[in-house]
Amino acid sequence: MSGSPVKRQRMESALDQLKQFTTVVADTGDFNAIDEYKPQDATTNPSLILAAAQMPAYQELVEEAIAYGKKLGGPQEEQIKNAIDKLFVLFGAEILKKIPGRVSTEVDARLSFDKDAMVARARRLIELYKEAGVGKDRILIKLSSTWEGIQAGKELEEQHGIHCNMTLLFSFAQAVACAEAGVTLISPFVGRILDWHVANTDKKSYEPQEDPGVKSVTKIYNYYKKFGYKTIVMGASFRNTGEIKALAGCDFLTISPKLLGELLKDNSKLAPALSVKAAQTSDSEKIHLDEKAFRWLHNEDQMAVEKLSDGIRKFAADAIKLERMLTERMFSAENGK
């Protein structure tokens, strides 16, 4: 005989409870780590792909990407760029075999201040997915939430029907501009905001509800829901499960396999912390941002300015490491090294 409903409910993992009111997304390039947690979607970034590309399990994908880059030919730089785009798409396509929803694939962070280059690179990634038999409805293109990135997202959505995930989002200004651009989804960061406050203020620990990253996402969620924006809010970059639980009820949350594992083992009761109903009574006031107002408001937030800049540099550095790794694999033999 099965246990009583009350007992069964008590034994339900925090992860299963979370899935009842939030879409759970796996934040990893290691697609073999996804199965156990049964997420709806998955997100990748240059750092995660770099880590996965160094694992023995994924060397076939790396070899396939290298072969593709060589086959297209052209200058060495062009071959490497094509190999990297292909590698991102190969990982994305494999991840899609394991999830019912969408995968996020990131445009090179070094293009973060070049709208046209971001649009072109995004369209190229979608074309590569198409060649792999994957339709654009299953892809989210990740772009840095600079002014240029947000405008690239607007153009991709409106003119090309390409869905965008705006990443490296730390300020309320970035969130408002993304909502006004009508992008599909935003990824406001939580843990990196906490990191900044721990490093730059006297306060070194926070209860989850007081966590500055949690408060930032809560404010954005309430603003979006109060004013009827359709853009999905997906909290990202978590340092602990307390932050995740404090954002239960958010549209989506993207979570690393390590923290998904902790939530799976956790049987404590979980209730939604965010809701559309509560958002209606929040004290948000609607604002409109043109480029000048956006730049001013974003610049007023020291944490956001530093973390956006830092995030772009980190993703760019990992893109360069990936390039070096592929360059070595592609050209070292023929250079007689």
UniProtKB/Swiss-Prot annotation:
Gene Ontology molecular-function annotations: identical protein binding; monosaccharide binding; transaldolase activity
Annotated keywords: Acetylation, Cytoplasm, Nucleus, Pentose shunt, Phosphoprotein, Schiff base, Transferase
In a knockout, what does one observe?
Deficient mice develop normally; however, males are sterile because of functional and structural defects of mitochondria. Mice spontaneously develop hepatocellular carcinoma. The liver of these mice present an accumulation of five-carbon sugarphosphates and a depletion of NADPH and GSH.
Q: How does it assemble?
A: Homodimer. Heterodimer with isoform 2. Interacts with KPNA1 and KPNA4.
Q: Which reaction does it catalyse?
A: D-sedoheptulose 7-phosphate + D-glyceraldehyde 3-phosphate = D-erythrose 4-phosphate + beta-D-fructose 6-phosphate
Task: Determine if Magnesium is one of this entry's keywords.
Answer: no
Which InterPro entries does this entry report, sorted A to Z? Answer: Aldolase_TIM, TAL/FSA, Transaldolase_1, Transaldolase_AS
**Which family does this protein fall into?**
Belongs to the transaldolase family. Type 1 subfamily.
In which pathway is this protein known to take part?
A: Carbohydrate degradation; pentose phosphate pathway; D-glyceraldehyde 3-phosphate and beta-D-fructose 6-phosphate from D-ribose 5-phosphate and D-xylulose 5-phosphate (non-oxidative stage): step 2/3
Q: What is its EC number?
A: 2.2.1.2
Which GO cellular component does the record give, naming just one? cytosol
Q: What is the lineage of its organism?
A: Eukaryota, Metazoa, Chordata, Craniata, Vertebrata
A Gene Ontology biological process in which this protein takes part is: carbohydrate metabolic process
**Domain comment in the entry:** The first 10 amino acids are essential for nuclear localization.
- Tell me the active site: 142
Q: What's the superkingdom here? A: Eukaryota
Where is the PTM N6-acetyllysine found along the chain?
A: 115, 219, 269, 286, 321
- What this protein is called in its record is Transaldolase
